Every structure is written in C-alpha cells, then in structure tokens.
Regions:
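DNA major-groove recognition helix of helix-turn-helix
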Residues: 9, 34, 52, 60-63
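DNA major-groove recognition helix of helix-turn-helix/homeodomain DNA-binding modules
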Residues: 43-58
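A short, Lys/Arg-rich alpha-helix, primarily the initiator
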Residues: 1-17
C-alpha cells in the first residue's frame, strides 16, 4: 500500500509533511506504514483516496 501512496505523492511533488498537514494523518503514521509496522485502517485509506482523487480500491491493487 505504501508504494502506491508514495507514487501518488511523488507524482504530485509533495512531501509526507504536506500530506499530513492536509489530511490530518500524522507523519508518524505515514512512517509506520512505510516501515511496515502496521497497515492503514480503512478510514485513513478513504481520506487518502479522497485527497489524491483515486478510488479507495487503488490502494488494494497489486503492487
């Protein structure tokens, strides 16, 4: 999932800090996803999907 997120973030040339500020998802949470400490909850995926204007299923597709 993080790889998909990172692709969207990088494509838009924004930082994790900007995503965190805009969505309310903390940079610590984003870091935990990156490091594989835990998977995102569905409500956070919905927030990211809306933020990046993609269907939530985008994050579930094979990487």
């Amino acid at each position: 999932m993080y790889k998909k997120y990172a692709e969207l973030r990088d494509k838009r040339n924004i930082t994790d800090y900007r995503v965190a500020a805009d969505t309310g998802i903390s940079t610590a949470t984003l870091s935990n996803w990156k490091n594989g400490n835990y998977a995102p909850k569905f409500d956070k995926l919905l927030i990211l999907a809306k933020y990046f204007d993609v269907p939530v299923e985008y994050f579930a597709e094979a990487e």
